[in-house]
């Protein structure tokens, strides 16, 4: 069991194939999914992430497949030397350095953000029952943000923009769904992947698809608990928030285009 340039290339290639299949499937479905299909997509996407997270050759299980196009030249390049280090070692060290710098930047941003929200007084607390335990999650209203989200590793906070009471009820339904399913930890897993493979655009595509699939899964689960009228209201509120967010971004882009 070891990590080599061939095992890393193998992990990337197998992940590309699986991601290609997922991309075609998602494109053909046009977001018309059943809950079973969404769960299967989540499993396949996590499987892709795990393969990238553990790019190892397992003795007795891994088998070499002969590829005569590009791969031999790439292997020869990786074995080449720069002084006493191989090209692979140099690239590996650069990758580690990049990961370290990104980790420092993200950690500082996260710490400063958590410090900021801890200074905000919660507008209320919501009680959530999970695994026979009841937890109080503080709800914070922040006027400067455009979207709702849940944040925090040890202690979670639900952050919401300045919205009316009716919209807030729908938003809390949505965010509590993410909390119960531990979606935040799954997203953290893919953030770690992006940290390790910052040079590989594949992981950003995987993260994007995975985030969208989680949103679809969450909406399907929430809607299963609502009446038909409540479902329509739920979708209308979320669409309204998405439209408002898109319009604000478009306005910002228009302003920047006029300035520059």
Question: What are the residue ranges of the model-derived segments?
Answer:
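Membrane-embedded and juxtamembrane structural elements of multi-pass membrane proteins
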Residues: 2-64, 68, 81-260
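Short membrane-interface loop/juxtamembrane segments of multi-pass integral membrane proteins
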Residues: 71-80
